[in-house]
């Protein structure tokens, strides 16, 4: 359960599978509620599940910040996490 009323800044770290697609969908919903959202994707875009691809394309069309996690932007990810109110892990799902 997340208290979206009392939190403004969100970082969502998503994988490229279906759980990651759920995270990208969450980013869309939080943005629609006026929240500041940054998305960090772990994995290769070309390996995204269909669910992730659909939500990724919607995020791009909405101009929501999406970043591919690599060695060059790890410090940016760390900085964003420190400034956020909530970090959501959408890398791995349950099996």
Task: Identify what each model region corresponds to.
Residues 1:
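N-terminal glycine-/serine-/threonine-rich phosphate-binding loop
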